[in-house]
Amino acid sequence: MKIIHKGLVEYLPTFEAMKTFNANRTASTEDELWVVEHPPVFTQGLAGKPEHLLIRDDIPIVQIDRGGQITYHGPGQLVVYTMIDFKRRKTSVRNIVSALENSIIATLAEYGIEAAADPKRPGVYVGERKIASLGLRIKGGSVYHGLALNVNMDLSPFTHINPCGYAGMEMTQIADFVQPCPTPDEVAAKLTAHLETQFTPKADNNE
């Protein structure tokens, strides 16, 4: 699995690059993780409803092809795009989602933050507050899009929407629990290590 750090990049060209990567991949294309941050942007998934945008401001909205509703990306949020051929790995999308959730939970545990997944709602939560979002697109036996983990960002734009379609959803971030707060790059080093562990094929034996 190749890990590519792209830094702070605009959302739309990154979205187009994901689609191109997935369309052009072959049976031998190596899976990739793209580690990025984005300037402020709302992204509206395939199930998105206009009423979940509560306040219209100057933050752009991009209609995209992942599952789910509307969410927000901005500087200080760690985004990891997961370009994974799950068919080749002989796994399921549900297992991919669990691997993403478990990697986030393990990363947060390294900072003393107790987080959990919720079987009724996508994402990772600290108590009732959401700290990470997940959204995937399944196409041709592969997935793309991925996860967004709030590290140290301006959370106020989340109040302009119903995050992921949930009215009143309260958001949180690593900076609410850890000071001095690690940088997104520092968190990325831990998170990608956990992702690599989750996606390393396990030996098939009876030992």
Curated annotation (Swiss-Prot):
Gene3D superfamilies: Bira Bifunctional Protein, Domain 2. Pathway: Protein modification; protein lipoylation via endogenous pathway; protein N(6)-(lipoyl)lysine from octanoyl-[acyl-carrier-protein]: step 1/2. It is an enzyme of class 2 (transferase). The record marks 130 as: Lowers pKa of active site Cys. It holds the Pfam family LplA-B_cat. Keywords: Acyltransferase, Cytoplasm, Transferase. Its EC number is 2.3.1.181. In the reaction, the free carboxyl group of octanoic acid is attached via an amide linkage to the epsilon-amino group of a specific lysine residue of lipoyl domains of lipoate-dependent enzymes. PANTHER family: LIPOYLTRANSFERASE 2, MITOCHONDRIAL-RELATED (PTHR10993:SF7), OCTANOYLTRANSFERASE (PTHR10993). This is Octanoyltransferase. It comes from Neisseria meningitidis serogroup C / serotype 2a (strain ATCC 700532 / DSM 15464 / FAM18). The lineage of its organism: Bacteria, Pseudomonadati, Pseudomonadota, Betaproteobacteria, Neisseriales. The gene is lipB.
